[in-house]
UniProtKB/Swiss-Prot annotation:
Keywords: CBS domain, Cell membrane, Membrane, Repeat, Transmembrane, Transmembrane helix. The keyword Cell membrane applies. This is UPF0053 protein Mb2387c. The chain crosses the membrane at residues 7-27, 89-109. GO terms for molecular function: flavin adenine dinucleotide binding. It is a multi-pass membrane protein.
Length: 435
């Protein structure tokens, strides 16, 4: 009968291991916000559960330690029991097989599923005992975490290993596959992850497309420009575009124009403008968004590494990186980045990256090519600033510039017509047809 005590102990420990696995899954699933609601509703055990949630990593480490201890001890007891009935070698193999099956079914899959399905009831029932066990075993648990950190390359974890960004991305992908998260919701979540890796210059309005006004103009003129352009914030320049001295707000212009006797004709923009905010064009978008929220500022001027104005970015530009394009009643329909005209002909934005052109035509561009966009490639081949009607042949493609005048009357190219170069025109490296 002595040997059966080991078998009974092994069975009990396997059951305890399953219980700790269920607790692990439960406290990892519950939401702190929902726990606060349970506390307000005075649910039994909610107060203890809130204290567990306040230091959740430590309690997860403790549960993992208890589950592992139960499994290892159960294996040892099972080996002792089987040794009385089989040879030592076969006993080890049999014990290993039984524990693999038990660990997977009884400790792994089943209890974890139950823990996730009944997360709040299990967490409420076990929070107080778990806190008591934590108080008793705290020195051992912390010692093992410190030992694990010492053996882990890098900085380690203060509270033990937890989900990395890659693991969270995998969870989001799995949630979409199972229909829990919609495709657009998944895209927004992915955009949040990428926000910290995206510099502000990638979403800015380039300097060449900025709308600005001179500081010596009147408030009435600025009001007219704001109405015509549809912008509520306009940079104010001094001697040139690199000398931005402030930002004028439509709200201030309305107040100055309609509340004064002269309609703002005698008030200069310099008297109405507010200070401008300057940030490096390499600033990550997540940091820029936090800064804008903290300072209650909706526009920042971007400065490149040489100290020149690279462009501007608004809080709307940052939010569009998360939720997609935001268009209001003043926004005009923008030209699609790529328009398929048939017969391998495309109309593309002059700002389209040349890598996208390579994908359209299967063309390889050299890595040392000192341009990033189609417009830049056109200017490189021409050797000058391209005008509408300019045409060149590069990498077996014919590029034809299209455009017109901008809001200040300057001639700009906006789109480029792409088509395969004619075989008989392969020798013509440049053909310029002014439009």
């Amino acid at each position: 009968m002595t040997g059966y005590y080991q078998l009974l102990g092994s069975i009990v420990l396997i059951g305890l291991g399953g219980l700790f696995a269920a607790i692990d899954a439960a406290i990892s699933t519950v939401s702190p916000a929902r726990v606060d609601e349970l506390v307000r509703d005075q649910r039994p055990g909610a107060g203890s559960l809130r204290k567990v949630m306040a230091d959740r990593p430590r309690y997860v480490n403790l549960v993992v330690l208890l589950r592992t201890s139960c499994e290892i001890t159960a294996t040892a007891l099972l080996v002792v029991f089987i040794r009385y009935h089989f040879s030592m070698v076969w006993g080890l193999y049999l014990a290993a097989g039984i524990m693999v099956l038990a660990s997977f079914v009884v400790v792994g899959v089943g209890p974890r599923t139950l823990g996730r399905q009944n997360a709040y009831s299990i967490s409420l029932a076990t929070a107080l005992p778990l806190r008591l066990i934590s108080w008793l075993l705290m020195p051992i648990s912390r010692l093992l975490v410190l030992l694990g950190n010492a053996l882990t390359p890098g900085r380690g974890f203060r509270n033990g290993p937890f989900a990395s960004e890659i693991e969270l991305r995998e969870v989001v992908d799995l949630a979409q596959q199972r229909g829990v998260v919609a495709a657009d919701e998944r895209r927004m979540i992915e955009s949040v992850f990428e926000l910290g890796d995206t510099p502000a210059r990638e979403v800015m309005v380039p300097r060449t497309e900025m709308i600005w006004i001179e500081s010596d103009k009147t408030a009435g003129q600025a009001m007219t420009l704001a109405v015509r352009s549809g912008h509520s914030r306009i940079p104010v320049i001094g001697e040139n575009v690199d000398d931005i001295v402030g930002v004028v707000y439509l709200k201030d212009l309305v107040e100055q124009t309609f509340c004064s006797t002269n309609g703002g004709r005698e008030t200069t923009v310099a008297r109405v403008m507010r200070p401008a905010v300057f940030v490096p064009d390499s600033k990550p978008l997540d940091a820029l968004l936090r800064e804008m929220q903290r300072d209650r500022n909706h526009m920042a001027l971007l400065v490149d590494e040489y100290g020149a104005i690279a462009g501007l970015v608004s809080i709307e530009d940052v939010l569009e990186e998360i939720v997609g394009e935001i268009a209001d009643e003043y926004d005009q329909a923008e030209t699609a980045p790529v328009e398929d005209l048939g017969d391998k002909r495309f109309r593309v934005s002059a700002r389209l990256p040349i890598e996208d052109v390579g994908e359209l035509y299967g063309v390889e561009f050299d890595d040392d090519l000192d341009v990033d966009t189609v417009g830049g490639l056109l200017a490189l081949e021409l050797g000058r600033v391209p005008l509408p009607g300019a045409e060149v042949i590069s990498h077996g493609l014919r590029l034809h510039a299209e455009g017109g005048t901008d809001h200040r009357g300057r001639v700009r190219i906006g789109t480029v017509l792409l088509s395969p170069a004619e075989p008989d025109g392969a020798d013509d490296e440049e053909a310029d047809h002014p439009g």
